[in-house]
Amino acid sequence: MVFRIASSPYTHNQRQTSRIMLLVVIAALPGIAAQTWFFGWGTLFQIVLAAITALVAEAIVLRLRKQSVASHLQDYSALLTGLLLAVSIPPLAPWWMVVLGTGFAIIIAKQLYGGLGQTPFNPAMIGYVVLLISFPVQMTSWLPPYEIAATTPDMLDTLRMIFTGHTASGGDMTLLRIGIDGISQATPLDTFKTSLRAGHSVEQIMQYPIYSGALAGVGWQWVNLAWLVGGVFLLWQKAIRWHIPVSFLLTLALCAALGWLFSPATLASPQLHLLSGATMLGAFFILTDPVTASTTNRGRLIFGALAGVLVWLIRSFGGYPDGVAFAVLLANITVPLIDYYTRPRVYGHRKG
């Protein structure tokens, strides 16, 4: 009788990093399609710019570090970083912003720390926060969804806006942000926070066109549901684990429900938190980054819950309308501590 002898581990996962990254890119397609449908061609153009910048920046740094360019680019991590940053910024943001943010994410936030697997912070969110702090006006200049927009740029005008700041007829961002009610529009979360500070009641705010007939803002709820579809695909493919997105969404919903219950006149409803902004994108595509998230199951639950609390606090009491990027980076800081206290006990270990 012949016995097969093998060393541990006895179960193997043959899925390579490049396959995981490619699955995430594929899972992002519903969200990209929804954003393009509601906000125009700019989303696709920003993705192309970010992808080119990410690949070029990665190649240059790898060449300087005397590492194999081809093998590293084939893991698709740079491409994914550019994609996540591109879908997070306004579709008509100037071209140099996505180039600057993506370059910073790849060169400083990723390669400076040693490359893939060495970064303590999510590179895409580092790039996003750098842009948000440096250029707050441009980073909050989202177009109204097409169905409530007074003017909608076509593909060529979108290109002109990104590269020149004006349409063929001389229109600018101020004109394009005007809604059907003649008032400059913002995202649902931005509108909610700004209007509250102006002294408007929640009941008045919910009558604005951006919330008309919608659970959480015209267009935005469908964008979030599209990212949710992509997230479910990742769970089905076992590209990510359920712990972080579930704990994040449940904690955010719980905090929002309690806040809304005790202060409905000043705090947003749970559905607004769950289906607006970057909630689903953050839950399934950003927080689940295996490099910067916790590595134990208990740690993942804590990590996701912490991010959920931080998002709610920033949105409700902070200076920024969304807060997902800041919550991700703040949660990243705690990962070593979380992993230290949640690591499994070694078999045979006994308390002293």
Swiss-Prot record:
Domain of life per record: Bacteria
Single GO cellular component term: plasma membrane
Cellular compartments annotated: Cell inner membrane
Main location: membrane
Record-listed FMN phosphoryl threonine modification sites: T187
GO BP annotations listed: electron transport chain; transmembrane transport
Cofactor (UniProt): FMN
InterPro entries: NqrB/RnfD (IPR004338), RnfD_bac (IPR011303)
EC number: 7.-.-.-
Presence of the UniProt keyword Cytoplasm in the record: no
Topology with respect to the bilayer: Multi-pass membrane protein
Catalytic EC class: translocase
Keywords: Cell inner membrane, Cell membrane, Electron transport, Flavoprotein, FMN, Membrane, Phosphoprotein, Translocase, Transmembrane, Transmembrane helix, Transport
Positions of transmembrane segments: 20-40, 42-62, 69-91, 123-143, 215-235, 242-262, 267-287, 301-321, 322-342
Assembly: The complex is composed of six subunits: RsxA, RsxB, RsxC, RsxD, RsxE and RsxG.
Family: Belongs to the NqrB/RnfD family.
Protein name listed in UniProt: Ion-translocating oxidoreductase complex subunit D
Lineage of the species this protein comes from: Bacteria, Pseudomonadati, Pseudomonadota, Gammaproteobacteria, Enterobacterales
Gene: rsxD
